[in-house]
């Protein structure tokens, strides 16, 4: 098997396992330099090491074979929600996860036509090729709402809406370490991808704002390396996209009223914290009032009217595009988890994790 060994697959598997070259070397009984040479293609691992590599990294031995479609990503091609607090190893793991999502999407698109990419300014978009949005975040948000025919009111089913416009949205399973260690991120490679993470899934309003934030990165920042300025711009985009100034302003209290903001939270689908900030941003309250409001919110946390709501109660805010594409391919193209696992050289469990589908096994019922 070493004759068809793909060095980039070793790098991908190692990053997915969040292991260093030294870790892999120790498990194999070789030097870190040897692992480095395997990954650069200077040398190849002995055939007898391949099964051990597969065991250590948790992939089938066929995972390392060359010839499968791939899309290599690096950190310059993605925007991380918490860039400064995301260690390099975790960013690399998240990017390797995104690479796998691309491979899965590619495999499904060979069989099923996904929604066309309707994202102005996105280089790969079929609907608005070459079109650009304004560079000002708020103006860009208003223009995208107009192009998507969203009107002036609250945004319902945000994640489903993004998927309907050709954006692949995924949320790693809670069992995936990256779900807890890496905040949301987005990338424009091939087809726009937004990765939402389980660490915000207990609060649907934070989850929706994060999705809108990543949408802002996709339309505003291209492949530019993220920084604090771009994070603020993505926040400004999300605020205007979810709560357009002209629409929300007449409903905001002129004096701080958390009970009223709790009502507006239900209508507009954004957190009370976001609404407090919006009041300050629009000049309705002072910095001092804003600080007192945040202190009061901390005291009210968990009380009736101020309890976070889980994403699990809102189907329109849960990714479903890839799962639905798989289900359609099963029906129309005789696809199965086993077929995808063989084609991608993944374990069946990994395929199910990324598709968010349960293992289907017959239930044995004993007759008494």
Please place each PLM-identified region on the residue numbering.
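Short juxta-domain linker segments that transition from a proline/glycine-rich
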Residues: 1-368
